[in-house]
């Protein structure tokens, strides 16, 4: 996973904004896949952070499949936010890195520490590891 710092993000054209986590959701509703979503509220804007597939299954399914990388992603997000329990993220403040209106938010940061989690590079690295291991 790319090791971001605030300085590197800004040098790469990202704008850093503060946001509050309004809600947290771990759901398999509507998609047949498990996703983790954080609804973020900034000053005059909002965004849902997440949407990556962490497992497959739906209510009443006979087969469920969870991904280790999905669990690791959730744990890394919790570590970045600074909580030990998933539900404790609600109400916490974070920073996001954005390239502006219409761009996806894939990088979230701790409100005080220079600690960041990048969904896109995390899952790209996991995919590369699987390919290297012949999976």
Where are these regions (language model features)?
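Short beta-rich binding modules
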Residues: 1-135
């Amino acid at each position: 996973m790319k090791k971001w710092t605030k300085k590197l993000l800004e040098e790469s054209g990202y704008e850093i904004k503060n946001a509050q986590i309004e809600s947290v959701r771990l759901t398999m509703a509507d998609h047949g896949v498990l996703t983790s979503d954080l609804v973020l509220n900034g000053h005059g804007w909002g965004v849902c952070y997440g949407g990556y597939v962490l497992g497959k299954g739906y209510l009443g399914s006979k087969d469920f499949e969870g991904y280790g990388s999905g669990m690791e992603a959730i744990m890394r997000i919790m570590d970045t936010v600074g909580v030990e329990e998933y539900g404790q993220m609600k109400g916490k403040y974070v920073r996001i890195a954005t390239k502006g209106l219409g761009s996806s938010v894939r990088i979230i940061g701790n409100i005080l520490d220079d600690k960041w989690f990048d969904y896109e590079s995390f899952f790209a690295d996991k995919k590369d590891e699987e390919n290297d291991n012949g999976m």
